[in-house]
Amino acid sequence: MPDAAYLAVFTMDKTGPKWRDWHARTEAEQAERADRGVAAVNAWNAAHRDIILHQGGPLGPTRRIDDAGAVSDVVNLLTVFMVVKAASHDEAARLFEDHPHMSIFPCDGVEVMPVLGA
């Protein structure tokens, strides 16, 4: 089976325990952990550079427009995204086991879905 493209979206519950733990830390503790996290993410990216199709990046504040044209600010779980290639959906999901965004930063999951038609 040829490799397919998969969108990976890291999630973070901004009311959950990992978020609360992060924000309970001092600025110095957050900075130290962020430095370790960035180095670990860079190492993960380097180790997986052959399967990363689009590096993606962090996602900022969200605005939503509904079918009536009303625009509003919303809070969602979406935090970071990237596109990878893998032989199967399960293989794509398993790529993110123990990813630094979950083991060091306060992300609590990764939603992985095929990019249809890619």
Name the predicted role of every residue range.
Residues M1-A118:
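Conserved, structured core segments of small domains
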